[in-house]
Regions:
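Bacterial N-terminal signal peptides that target proteins for export
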Residues: 1-11
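Bacterial N-terminal signal peptides
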Residues: 9-19
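Flexible, polar/low-complexity N-terminal or interdomain linker segments that lie immediately upstream
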Residues: 23-121
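Positively charged, proline/Ser/Thr-rich regional signature most characteristic
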Residues: 77-169, 220
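Solvent-exposed loop/turn segments at secondary-structure junctions
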Residues: 115-119, 134-137, 177-181, 206-210
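A short acidic (Asp/Glu
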Residues: 121-122, 182-187, 212-213
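Catalytic cysteine-centered active loop of the rhodanese-like fold, especially the PTP/DSP P-loop
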Residues: 148-207
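Active-site neighborhoods of enzymes that stabilize oxyanions during catalysis
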Residues: 213-220
Length: 220
């Protein structure tokens, strides 16, 4: 009888010891929003991609975005408000724009403003890559090429040497995050060309926030 009690007590002790670990090992759901939005379906290069958050409760941030002290300049902290009329958005708004675009709304274009070496590490599904250098004459962009982008990609048109933006798309731009100047450079260039500020949206958090929230990324 004493042996049985001792054995039973040992089993209880073992169960109590492993219980916290078992509870920790059991992942709880990781939705996108409070209220149950768990996934979003978007198109990327003709394929349907499911955007969701990493479901591993123990997952850590990507090492690519773990640095805190990149040299400034050039990696300086960007303001919340980039320019009058340009709306700063967050992750939920970005996902909404991606869903609208993927559903066939061609008045929206989500743009990854980073250079190809950054994009190769991963990008937001549904975005198209337009490196900030493509709109920057100081970096070698020529007026003819810029004009082709404005008309062919953005839906603007030129009349008597002036740009018209009545049918221009809403551009949603991002880069690496709040310490990155690539999408701000694109936005400032567009504003200089006369692009309407209300048709430009800026995801300030960029890839840093997107990655740190465990949201889906794709590689070219």
């Amino acid at each position: 009888m004493g042996i049985q009690k001792t054995f039973a007590g040992a089993l209880v002790a073992v169960a109590m010891t492993i219980a916290p670990f078992a509870a920790h090992a059991e992942n709880k759901p990781v939705d996108i929003t409070f209220g149950g939005k768990a996934t979003a379906q978007v198109k990327h290069n003709g394929k349907i991609i499911t955007i969701q958050r990493v479901q591993d409760n123990g997952n850590n941030v990507d090492a690519s975005f773990a640095k805190t002290s990149r040299p400034c300049p050039p990696f300086c902290i960007q303001p919340i408000s980039l320019a009058p009329g340009v709306e700063t958005i967050g992750e939920n708004e970005m996902i909404d724009y991606l869903e609208q675009m993927s559903a066939g709304d061609d008045s929206i274009l989500v743009i990854d403003s980073r250079t190809p070496n950054w994009v190769a590490r991963g990008q937001i599904p549904g975005a198209v890559n337009l490196p900030w250098t493509k709109l920057n004459t100081a970096k070698g962009a020529d007026p003819l090429s810029i004009g082709e982008i404005m008309e062919g990609e953005f839906g603007a048109n030129q009349f008597d040497g002036l740009w018209k933006f009545a049918k221009a798309k809403t551009l949603v731009m991002y880069c690496n995050g709040m310490w990155c100047g690539q999408s701000p450079a694109n936005i400032k260039a567009l504003l200089d060309f006369g692009y309407p500020a209300h048709k430009i949206k800026w995801y300030r958090g960029g890839m840093q926030n997107w990655s740190n929230l465990g949201l889906t990324t794709v590689k070219p």
